[in-house]
């Protein structure tokens, strides 16, 4: 996509023991078809006891990108996000789960859609990764037919906003659904669904859903 003025983009990836996923997440992210923007990636490692951090640092960083790894001894996604927001330099903030893989077009579409002088929210078009268990497959089949998944900008797995949008609240509260909390700070007219796809794995098993 062309015609977008240069932007500063921060991609915040909270990660707690995500060694099995972080390499795939970053590899897909770095393959984004985007140029002409300053992009920093902040891996927000919180309470990790595996080699998430080492694996994140091993993925080759493309020219024009910057990787920063912020390590917290304590676990907790929301506290990590608050710390990441303070460290981020972007005028576009993208919040990406460590087990999600974006397709190449999505970041460029986000940069084009989010006008810097407005409070706006955007997300891509989700593709739920095929589940392993029969129960999760059935749940996923119903989930993807929900109206907010099919036609809205749901934001689970990845969501983005302008700085003006992020200024609508302070620290992230101690809640479960950060994407829902963020989305509800924007009116339907301020939420943008983009055609760029991303792949999101649903948690497995009845007890985790």
Where are these regions (language model features)?
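Cell-envelope/extracellular polymer assembly enzymes that use nucleotide-activated donors
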Residues: 8-10, 40, 181
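Short, well-formed alpha-helical segments that are part of the catalytic scaffolds
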Residues: 18-32, 55
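A conserved acidic beta->alpha catalytic loop
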Residues: 28, 45-54, 74
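Short beta-strand/loop segment that forms part of the nucleotide-sugar
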Residues: 37-48, 68-70
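Glycine-rich, basic loop-to-helix element that forms the pyrophosphate-binding segment
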Residues: 71-88
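Short aromatic/hydrophobic "clamp" motif used to bind/position activated sugar donors
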Residues: 93
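The conserved acidic donor/metal-binding loop of glycosyltransferases
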Residues: 97-101
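Conserved donor NDP-sugar-binding/catalytic core segment of glycosyltransferases
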Residues: 104-134
């Amino acid at each position: 996509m062309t015609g977008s003025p240069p932007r500063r983009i921060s991609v915040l990836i909270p990660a707690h023991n995500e060694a099995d996923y972080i390499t795939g997440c970053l590899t897909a992210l770095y393959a984004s078809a985007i140029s002409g923007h300053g992009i920093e990636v902040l891996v927000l490692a919180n309470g990790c006891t595996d080699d998430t951090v080492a694996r994140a640092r091993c993925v080759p960083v493309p020219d024009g990108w910057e990787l920063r790894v912020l390590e917290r001894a304590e676990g907790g996604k929301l506290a990590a996000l608050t710390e990441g927001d303070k460290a981020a330099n972007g005028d576009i903030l993208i919040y990406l789960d460590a087990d999600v893989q974006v397709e190449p077009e999505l970041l460029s579409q986000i940069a084009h859609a989010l006008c810097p002088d407005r409070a706006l929210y955007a997300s891509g078009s989700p593709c739920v990764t095929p589940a392993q268990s029969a129960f999760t497959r059935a749940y996923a089949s119903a989930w993807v037919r929900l109206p907010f998944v099919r036609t809205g900008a749901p934001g689970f797995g990845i969501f983005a906003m302008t700085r003006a949008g992020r200024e609508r609240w302070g620290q992230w509260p101690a809640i479960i659904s950060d994407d829902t909390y963020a989305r509800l700070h924007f009116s339907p007219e301020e939420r943008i669904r983009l055609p760029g796809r991303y792949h999101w794995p649903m948690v497995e098993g009845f007890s985790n859903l």
